[in-house]
């Protein structure tokens, strides 16, 4: 599998160096937004706490198209913090993902032989709240990180839709932290910092103004590991709906659903509205893969960078 990784990397880098010349044509653009939410209460009979939240996101793209060559790049980033009552500041969003596809036209500019590279991680340490001391973090930048190289076919019937399918995909799970790797976090063997997987991969993305001042984006990633429990498919599905109120104000709602068979999550049961840990026979708390879900809504400043060409 290391030979496959090396071959795919050489093909990707060679193709990018060959075609990224001065006579190329690029289209670039994206969306930048900052959302702010604040609640202030004084002698409020209904109860509640003061809160402040700030979220920022960026969805950027750079696309090259000339002759039979197509090269698409997407960078998606998100980070958010919230302070509620007397609690310390906590993050409520943290995403970093880069996706690059280099393709050669196979049929009528709709099907492309494609090499894909994907990197996904986060910016800052994550904690199992309310414990936020620096020794209790459960994730950080590059712990985990997911890198993926794939050979396959990309279907691009329209500029706003693409669906890539690969039966030959190498994926690395990286846990670049001693304490987390010793604990065997995110599916690596205890003491190891890298887990290698080989399987099938699907990557689909749709982004379009579905009506005036309304932009809809959704992307779906599916991965099946041939080497271990291929029936347990990893899922990463994101949706972002943005509604432009005026030139600079935008309302947006985003969701993300993740299922990762390598990620062990603490298991709780609902006991009359109270979360109660589910314990093993030895008294330790049970862990296992679970469906993760995140939803963010906000109103704030947004700037849409319309695509422009560079020749």
Question: Where are the model-predicted features located?
Answer:
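Residues on the lipid-exposed face of transmembrane beta-strands in outer-membrane beta-barrel proteins
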Residues: 30, 34-36, 56-64, 98-104, ...
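Membrane-embedded beta-strand positions of outer-membrane beta-barrel proteins
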Residues: 30-32, 73, 113-117, 151, ...
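Transmembrane beta-strands of outer-membrane beta-barrel pores
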Residues: 34-40, 66-68, 77-83, 117-125, ...
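Outer-membrane beta-barrel translocator domains and adjoining extracellular loop/strand segments
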Residues: 41-46, 85-89, 126-132, 175-182, ...
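Extracellular loop and loop/strand-boundary signature of outer-membrane beta-barrel proteins
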Residues: 43-48, 83-88, 132-139, 187-192, ...
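Residues that define the transmembrane beta-barrel architecture of outer-membrane proteins
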Residues: 50-56, 92-96, 143-147, 194-200, ...
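Repeated loop/turn-to-beta-strand initiation elements of outer-membrane beta-barrel proteins
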Residues: 69-71, 110-113, 160-163, 213-216, ...
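Outer-membrane beta-barrel "beta-signal"
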Residues: 291-311
């Amino acid at each position: 599998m290391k030979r496959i990784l090396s071959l795919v990397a050489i093909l990707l880098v060679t193709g990018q160096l060959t075609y990224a010349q001065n006579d190329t044509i690029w289209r670039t653009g994206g969306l930048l937004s900052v959302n702010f939410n604040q609640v202030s209460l004084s002698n409020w009979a209904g109860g509640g706490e003061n809160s402040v939240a700030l979220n920022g996101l960026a969805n950027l793209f750079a696309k090259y198209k000339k002759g039979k060559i197509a090269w698409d790049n997407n960078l998606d980033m998100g980070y958010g913090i919230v302070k509620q009552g007397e609690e310390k500041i906590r993050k409520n969003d943290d995403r970093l993902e880069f996706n690059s596809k280099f393709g050669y036209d196979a049929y009528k500019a709709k099907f492309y032989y494609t090499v894909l590279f994907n990197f996904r991680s986060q910016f800052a340490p994550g904690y199992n709240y309310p414990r936020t001391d620096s020794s209790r973090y459960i994730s950080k930048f590059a712990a985990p990180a997911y890198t993926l190289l794939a050979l396959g076919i990309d279907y691009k019937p329209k500029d706003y839709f693409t669906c890539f399918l690969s039966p030959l995909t190498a994926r690395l799970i990286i846990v670049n932290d001693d304490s987390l790797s010793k604990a065997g976090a995110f599916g690596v063997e205890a003491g190891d910092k890298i887990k290698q997987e080989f399987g099938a991969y699907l990557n689909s993305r749709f982004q379009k103004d579905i009506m005036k001042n309304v932009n809809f984006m959704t992307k779906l990633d599916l991965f099946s590991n041939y080497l271990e429990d291929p029936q347990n498919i990893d899922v990463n599905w994101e949706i972002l709906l943005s509604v432009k109120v005026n030139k600079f104000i935008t309302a947006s709602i985003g969701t993300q659903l993740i299922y990762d068979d390598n990620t062990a999550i603490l298991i709780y049961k609902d006991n009359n509205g109270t979360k109660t840990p589910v314990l093993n026979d030895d008294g330790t708390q049970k862990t296992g893969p679970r469906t993760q879900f995140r939803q963010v809504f906000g109103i704030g400043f947004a700037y849409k960078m319309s695509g422009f060409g560079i020749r």
